[in-house]
């Protein structure tokens, strides 16, 4: 599957949608060939699952990419240059690697944005590192990608697992669901789930909780009946889910059918899962990097524009891909080019900030390339209080609280130590 989207050509305001400091230095002279290249189009790649259990989220990512490109086009482009997106279905890790290599070697993209699967993100990052191209990960949560598998050319707009665990864990602590309590955990059996499980175990151990059940779930699983019987017999204080994609929706529906009433929550979540389950089946409290009920002026304006274009509110994957485009556009605009080394320097500069449409600006952690930004906890509304198919949860304020630094979200990270190759 291949699509091309084009930004318009002309001058995008240097202070447009996102703010920043720390402009990278550039030379004042250039060879004629370089000048010609700088007058040509900027080509970027977008890889994300459009099929399989992550496909529904991938479709939101595509919608966001298209909307972002149209908005930049309407604002005049980036430094007078057109930008083209080559968009492909990443399918699986092997296919993602092949397509990333083709984008770099044949299509000559200057960077790649996207992905949701942690396994595919790893293979894309390996190709991007060899090709010295920026890769902005928009949906893969694995702590290992920020740890032992980190890459100098890879940056993460999506929050990592430990950030969700620390944010959601603070809610469970306040609710008295950790110390001395028994958890039953279900985990998606791939890199994302494994990382999330390790982070959750670490949190539970640090705060005096007990793990009484721990099951790995194949990513293609649709029948949870045997696991639900185990949960019923175990009688946990909390059912914690580290599932992904359509797994969560299926579990919600079957959990309700079994009539189980144990508190439920988890550390990995996408709002599309709540919508797909519906108000009657959606339960518990979950972390979210962003959702359509975030009460800031810019977030609500973004929601209105998205609804006007697509007839439904944006999901958190749409938010992450949209922000990745704007962050990449900011870097190209501020460095006056597409050189990967200059963009890395710009991203790593502690003065470089990004307007995340929240109460605080975000910035990349220079030692791991993780974007630090606020997170939210959403809680299912009782079905009789739901007014429409979208507004089926309430939201916390931004996490961490205003009195805590964003770095607190990455405390006690697992996944190994990041060491960028020189």
Regions found by a protein language model. Name each.
Residues 2-7, 12-22, 29-31, 37-422:
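Extracytosolic ligand-binding ectodomains
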